[in-house]
């Protein structure tokens, strides 16, 4: 009594976030602590009971079991923690935060406590997983976060999925060595659009400086040089809103990933095109500005109207109206990495795009 402690400060953070409309991804305990034996099954039950009773009435909690760990390590501890929380708190969503380049569905897709799947596509560029044999996808596909979304959505029971940890803006490629170069705004845009257009229900954005709340007097990690409040001005951070604006301009719950919308070559690595659609609209993300053949018959409408939408600044430009089945589109700016655009197609009678103007 009279002492402002750890859990008092946790309460303050959660309530401060709630006042600002922010949800907290509540990582109960970091995976490394469980792996090293810092919490057993009985302790997980007691801890889960404490957490659930303390926060079950907070409106802005999303429970995250695990903490950057493979789900086959101390599985009994994770199941006990999750089931205990769920037995008390039946209102909040729950998922599992897996290790890099893995997916929660590998271990918990049948678990009654799992509400949605999460994958960590991680921070490595193509070719950096040389000796990693525990990842879900083969070497050479490290940046293809869309593959995790597709893999998850092929599982049964079908659960929503999200990339919980893609490459962060301004963090080293490969995470640890600044000499490898840093991920930039065009990279974090690509991860966001690839994942969402491949079927993820949302996206996680990260920034190296914001992650560490880097401020004067604190030693930086991962080669960070920018203070966290200065990083709020970085382009990738401010461009995430344009993806949300785009997706919510169209009927959300009928949207599916559909790569058959691409009549030509879907492409590999940075040339990969990713399409998503509803009944009468289609969105295609093109990271390199290359020509692409699109099957307009995949959506309803006698004629289709087309626009280019810029993920960099949300600018919208009208292309024209089409009645043919397959049409070739190429945005301005040339064929190069980071010249990314979204092709919007709608039934010619629909007014969805007005929300973007």
Where are the regions that the model predicts?
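Short strand-edge motifs at loop-to-beta-strand transitions and within beta-strands
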Residues: 327-329
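Catalytic-core region of carbohydrate-active enzymes that cleave or remodel glycosidic bonds
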Residues: 111-126, 130-214
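Short, electropositive alpha-helical surface patch
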Residues: 41-51, 180-183, 222-227
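Aromatic- and carboxylate-lined catalytic core of secreted/periplasmic carbohydrate-active enzymes
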Residues: 157-161, 168-172, 184-320, 332-357
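Active-site mouth of glycoside hydrolases
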Residues: 1-128, 133-135, 139, 143-144
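Short, flexible, glycine/charge-rich loop motifs used to bind or transfer phosphoryl groups or to couple energy/partner
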Residues: 51-54, 84, 104-108, 150-152, ...
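Short amphipathic alpha-helical segments and helix-helix/interface helices
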Residues: 14, 52, 82, 148-153, ...
């Amino acid at each position: 009594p009279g002492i402002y402690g750890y859990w008092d400060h946790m309460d303050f953070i959660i309530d401060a976030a709630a006042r600002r409309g922010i949800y907290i991804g509540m990582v109960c305990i970091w995976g490394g602590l469980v792996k090293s034996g810092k919490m057993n099954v009985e302790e997980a039950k007691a801890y889960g009971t404490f957490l659930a009773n303390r926060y079950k009435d907070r409106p802005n909690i999303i429970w995250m079991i695990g903490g950057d760990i493979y789900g086959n390590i101390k599985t009994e501890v994770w199941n006990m923690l999750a089931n205990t929380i769920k037995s008390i708190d039946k209102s909040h969503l729950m998922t599992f935060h897996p290790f890099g380049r893995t997916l929660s569905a590998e271990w918990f897709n049948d678990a009654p406590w799992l509400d949605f799947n999460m994958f960590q596509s991680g921070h490595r560029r193509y070719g950096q997983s040389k000796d990693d044999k525990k990842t879900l996808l083969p070497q050479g596909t490290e940046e293809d976060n869309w593959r995790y979304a597709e893999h998850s959505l092929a599982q049964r029971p079908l659960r929503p999925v999200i990339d919980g940890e893609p490459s962060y803006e301004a963090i080293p490629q490969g995470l640890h060595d600044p000499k490898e170069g840093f991920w930039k705004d065009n990279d974090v845009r690509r991860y966001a659009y690839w994942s969402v257009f491949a079927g993820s229900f949302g996206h996680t954005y990260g920034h190296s400086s914001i992650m560490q709340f880097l401020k004067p007097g604190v030693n930086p990690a991962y080669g960070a040089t920018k203070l966290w409040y200065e990083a709020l001005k970085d382009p990738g951070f401010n461009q995430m809103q344009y993806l949300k604006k785009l997706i919510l301009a169209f009927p959300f719950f009928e949207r599916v990933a559909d790569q058959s919308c691409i009549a030509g070559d879907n492409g590999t690595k940075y040339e990969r095109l990713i399409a998503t659609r509803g009944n009468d609209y289609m969105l295609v993300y093109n990271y390199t500005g290359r020509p692409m053949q699109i099957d307009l018959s995949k959506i309803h409408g006698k004629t289709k109207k087309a626009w280019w939408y810029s993920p960099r600044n949300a600018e919208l430009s009208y292309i024209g109206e089409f009645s043919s089945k397959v049409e070739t589109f190429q945005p301005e700016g040339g064929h190069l990495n980071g010249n990314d655009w979204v092709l919007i197609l709608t039934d010619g009678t629909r007014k969805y795009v007005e929300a973007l103007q």
